[in-house]
């Protein structure tokens, strides 16, 4: 066989293989989209219920943490002079 014939057959095989892989990937994409649509159709996600705001929410989180931070600093300084 001639080297140009072998090169031509190699390119033919390469493009056929790449074409089959591309076709399979497109088929896989459409199958996954179809399954996703079927699952969403038969098992829809529940609508989230809005949560009510707490009645006595502190205005500032730092105001609640200030005594805790001060106690932690005092404890650290007492143990590590």
UniProtKB/Swiss-Prot annotation:
Its main location: membrane. The keyword Membrane applies. It is an enzyme of class 7 (translocase). The chain crosses the membrane at residues 12-32. It catalyses: oxaloacetate + 2 Na(+)(in) + H(+) = pyruvate + 2 Na(+)(out) + CO2. GO terms for biological process: sodium ion export across plasma membrane. GO terms for molecular function: decarboxylation-driven active transmembrane transporter activity; oxaloacetate decarboxylase activity; sodium ion transmembrane transporter activity. Its cofactor is Na(+). Keywords: Cell membrane, Ion transport, Membrane, Sodium, Sodium transport, Translocase, Transmembrane, Transmembrane helix, Transport. GO terms for cellular component: plasma membrane. Heterotrimer of an alpha, a beta and a gamma subunit. Catalyzes the decarboxylation of oxaloacetate coupled to Na(+) translocation. This is Oxaloacetate decarboxylase gamma chain 3.
């Amino acid at each position: 066989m001639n080297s140009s014939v072998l090169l031509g057959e190699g390119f033919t095989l390469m493009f056929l293989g790449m074409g089959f892989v591309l076709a399979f990937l497109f088929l896989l994409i459409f199958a996954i989209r179809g399954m996703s649509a079927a699952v969403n159709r038969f098992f829809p996600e529940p609508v989230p219920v809005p949560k009510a705001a707490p009645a006595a929410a502190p205005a500032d989180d730092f105001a609640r943490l200030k005594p805790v931070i001060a106690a932690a600093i005092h404890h650290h300084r007492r143990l590590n002079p």
